């Protein structure tokens, strides 16, 4: 891949760039004019050592518009991690529920905790953005993914254990209340997040959200294959121009 300075091609890339903030989302659905724009938050894959796998993330998202109508979109995408903690993730467009066609890949992500680099690659423009990746790989999942009960009014409930895709998971249901007036509501509304977390893999295999703000979403990790993926899966594609957006190293004054 050819590496160039970030500013040198910034303006030429602006028309096709996907902001890094959207890297956590497959896509976004706008509400009716005058409403808010909900955001879909997917699962987070940590750089866990010695826990290699390949899997598919399936998402179904229902968003209610200001006029009371709702729309449902979906997609699926490939994720993988090797024993060194390197992570590969696809991002795909969302398509209306019922559409049988495979959606287009919008972004490819390559996270390397050893080199402390992360690439966001865009197939439509054959361009990759290179950023610092400050997260270091670790050997033990330090959390089951749950938030702290009582913080900001959050109520957390232990749902016990369940085997999903052959892996033991810990279930948690979290409920927060949306204050009156937040979205035109005259009384408090519950937002519920239920997830089943695999300590072996270090992330949620199931994530269900019921939220008046962002809509209802169902995320499932399926087709989990334990073991080392093909090493080529963690290499950014050949022939892409790389925009180096890393921060310059700090220099000490003498």
Across the structure, where does each feature detected by a protein language model lie?
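Bacterial N-terminal signal peptides that target proteins for export
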Residues: 1-9
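Bacterial N-terminal signal peptides
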Residues: 8-17
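Extended soluble regions of mature proteins
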Residues: 25-254
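Boundary at the C-terminal end of the N-terminal hydrophobic targeting segment
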Residues: 19-25
């Amino acid at each position: 891949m050819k590496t160039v300075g970030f500013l040198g091609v910034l303006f030429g890339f602006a028309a096709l760039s996907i902001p890094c903030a959207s890297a956590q989302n497959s896509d976004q659905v706008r509400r009716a004019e005058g409403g808010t724009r909900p955001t879909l938050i997917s699962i987070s894959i940590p750089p866990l050592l010695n826990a290699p796998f390949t899997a598919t993330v399936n998402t179904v998202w229902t968003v209610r518009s200001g006029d009371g109508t709702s729309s449902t979109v979906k997609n699926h995408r490939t994720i993988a991690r090797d024993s060194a903690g390197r992570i590969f993730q696809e991002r795909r467009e969302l398509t209306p529920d019922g559409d049988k066609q495979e959606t287009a890949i919008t972004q490819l992500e390559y996270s390397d905790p050893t080199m402390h680099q992360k690439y966001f690659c865009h197939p439509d423009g054959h361009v990759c953005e290179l950023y610092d990746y400050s997260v270091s790989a670790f050997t033990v999942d330090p959390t089951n993914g749950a938030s702290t009960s009582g913080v900001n009014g959050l109520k957390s409930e232990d749902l016990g254990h369940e085997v999903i895709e052959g892996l033991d998971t810990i279930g948690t249901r979290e409920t927060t209340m949306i204050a009156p007036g937040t979205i035109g509501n005259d009384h408090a509304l519950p937002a519920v997040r239920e997830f089943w977390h695999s300590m072996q893999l270090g992330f949620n295999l199931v994530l269900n959200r019921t939220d008046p703000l962002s809509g209802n979403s169902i995320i499932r990790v399926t087709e989990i294959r334990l073991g080392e993926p093909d090493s080529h899966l963690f290499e950014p594609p050949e022939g892409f121009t790389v925009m180096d957006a890393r921060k310059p190293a700090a220099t000490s004054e003498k």
